[in-house]
């Protein structure tokens, strides 16, 4: 075995099983491409990406860790989001949440 090596069992691995998901139509209205990483808080992505933001609080892209989705200028696409696991507190990114993503104190 190599240090850090992972030896998964045979078969399919289901990502984010059992978590809440949300499908959103997103349009890049900017003049440059915008790329969003797998774990970026979708509510706080580039302001040139237009979509109904409020429902996306506490969600990220439902894609494999370390990957990203690129939106070319003028491009519209539908993406699936998944709720963050854990406490639901969101810190950092653009600083628009800085605490609970949902609930009375959000």
Swiss-Prot record:
One of its GO terms (cellular component) is urease complex. The keyword DNA-binding does not apply. Pfam families: Urease_beta (PF00699). Signal peptide: none annotated. One of its GO terms (molecular function) is urease activity. GO terms for biological process: urea catabolic process. Keywords: Cytoplasm, Hydrolase. It is an enzyme of class 3 (hydrolase). The keyword Hydrolase applies. Pathway: Nitrogen metabolism; urea degradation; CO(2) and NH(3) from urea (urease route): step 1/1. Its EC number is 3.5.1.5. It comes from the Bacteria. It is found in: Cytoplasm. Belongs to the urease beta subunit family. Heterotrimer of UreA (gamma), UreB (beta) and UreC (alpha) subunits. Three heterotrimers associate to form the active enzyme. NCBIfam families: PRK13203.1 (NF009682), urease_beta (TIGR00192). PANTHER family: UREASE. This is Urease subunit beta. It comes from Alkalilimnicola ehrlichii (strain ATCC BAA-1101 / DSM 17681 / MLHE-1). The gene is ureB.
């Amino acid at each position: 075995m190599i240090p850090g090596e992972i030896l998964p069992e045979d078969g399919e691995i289901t990502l984010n099983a059992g978590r809440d998901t949300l499908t959103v139509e997103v349009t890049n209205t900017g003049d440059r491409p915008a790329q969003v990483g797998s774990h970026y808080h979708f509510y706080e992505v580039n302001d040139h990406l237009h979509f109904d933001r409020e429902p996306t609080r506490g969600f990220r892209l439902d894609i494999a860790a370390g990957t990203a989705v690129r939106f070319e200028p003028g491009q519209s696409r539908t993406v699936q989001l998944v709720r963050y696991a854990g406490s639901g507190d969101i810190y950092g990114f653009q600083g628009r949440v800085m605490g609970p993503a949902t609930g009375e104190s959000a």
